[in-house]
């Protein structure tokens, strides 16, 4: 049985109860982890209120604002972790964004600003958060991010996000190579399409889900909690020999030729 008792885990990217990050947070909590949750701050406090109410049953010991495009907020987040916890064991990176206009139509029409924004939030944030977490993972650790098949195959309308996920998976390998000597493992979970706030921006997402339900060996898509189970496994000592990998949790869709 998975046991994360005594482990400190920071979970990023929870927006609502359909977020994959929410499924991961629930399973880490069920395994006994001590949770810290970040939220995206906004002027009206909309996300803070919504996420705070959602995660309250998990009793997180830290609840922090963190916009990954704001270097000061990132530093403040990890300073607080150091001061309150002293150590970080698990980092969950569930952050992705691209402008809606760049997730439909022709990829060649992606704007320069849209391309930069997608890679900054979806890819570089993993590098930056991992760098901030590194000195706090004094007893080793596990860093886990979320990818998608569109990072290795051309998926209609996924466009610039596919490029961002390809960069994310490469970043996993480079971070795993760098951090392995400190017993810090870095892995990605490539989940099948799930209806989330982020995926709703992708043109034709419902068609993608229906296609997976028809073609995947299990004849269904996966749930947030199934992804959460995999994350809890990767965060645990049961996965102590796994790093630099992309694990597909997609009902088997990735293996199909057509």
Curated annotation (Swiss-Prot):
Alphabetical list of Pfam families matching this protein: adh_short_C2 (PF13561)
Pathway: Lipid metabolism; fatty acid biosynthesis
Entry EC no(s): 1.3.1.9
Organism of derivation: Nostoc sp. (strain PCC 7120 / SAG 25.82 / UTEX 2576)
Source taxon at top rank: Bacteria
Annotated keywords: Fatty acid biosynthesis, Fatty acid metabolism, Lipid biosynthesis, Lipid metabolism, NAD, Oxidoreductase
PANTHER family to which the protein is assigned, alphabetical: ENOYL-[ACYL-CARRIER-PROTEIN] REDUCTASE (PTHR43159), ENOYL-[ACYL-CARRIER-PROTEIN] REDUCTASE [NADH], CHLOROPLASTIC (PTHR43159:SF2)
This protein's name: Enoyl-[acyl-carrier-protein] reductase [NADH] FabI
Binding residues annotated for substrate, in chain numbering: 98
Top-tier EC class: oxidoreductase
Active-site residues from the entry: 148, 158
Function text: Catalyzes the reduction of a carbon-carbon double bond in an enoyl moiety that is covalently linked to an acyl carrier protein (ACP). Involved in the elongation cycle of fatty acid which are used in the lipid metabolism.
InterPro entries linked to this entry: Enoyl-ACP_Rdtase_NADH (IPR014358), NAD(P)-bd_dom_sf (IPR036291), SDR_fam (IPR002347)
GO molecular-function terms, A-Z: enoyl-[acyl-carrier-protein] reductase (NADH) activity; identical protein binding
Binding site for NAD(+): 13, 19-20, 67-68, 95, 165, 194-198
Reactions it catalyzes: a 2,3-saturated acyl-[ACP] + NAD(+) = a (2E)-enoyl-[ACP] + NADH + H(+)
UniProt-listed GO biological process terms: fatty acid elongation
Subunit structure and binding partners: Homotetramer.
Family: Belongs to the short-chain dehydrogenases/reductases (SDR) family. FabI subfamily.
